[in-house]
Amino acid sequence: VEFPYSDDEKYIELEKRARAELSMPSMRRSRLKKAISMKGLVTAIEAHSGITGLIAEKTVVYSGGGARQFDAMWISSLCDSVMRGKPDIELVDITSRLRTLDDIMDVTTKPVIFDGDTGGLTEHFVYTVRTLERMGVSMVVIEDKTGLKKNSLFGAQAAQTQAEVSDFCEKIRAGKNAQKTADLMICARIESLILEKGMNDALSRARAYTAAGADAVMIHSRKREPDEVFEFAEKF
């Protein structure tokens, strides 16, 4: 709810109370799923610190008599690594990632999508899911890679290994079983197109991952044209 601008003390106090409630984990966690249900298409922008979170929170574009703003924030592992001067190889540990997340959530109210890299070991991912859910995160995205994680933009030029479908499905199932509520969504990011394994492999994995319990899938492409992304969306 956006209250109309007013200098009236009642409105200011009402807005302050509303924003305080929206920042609570139980309120924030469910809002992305509700937004998707209501709008269909939602927009998210990357944030990797308290100040970038505030920029995402407060950016509003007024046009044609209406106002547009971002629906959610994406907490990127790439940007979280780069701002520390570290390579994007899952070097920044989960405790540090969660500290960044907490800094952002402390000063914002928008729903959060957390980039969870590969999710780590299945046994570790279970605890990550529980922590993210408790903090009020709306979605965690994990990619189907194994071994040393490399940035996807390298594609097949860098040695990267895609996880076995059965192993990744087990990780998804373990994460879903660890949840205490239905609010947190697990999104399976598919690297088939990045690793040049073809559309059929991507579609086969997408169906397997959703059958395992994934709430959403993300398809990744390095190409400048969006054709293969659109093709995937149409066929899936």
Tell what function each PLM region has.
Residues 1-14:
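Extended, hydrophobic interaction surfaces within ordered domains
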Residues 15-236:
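Alpha/beta enzyme core
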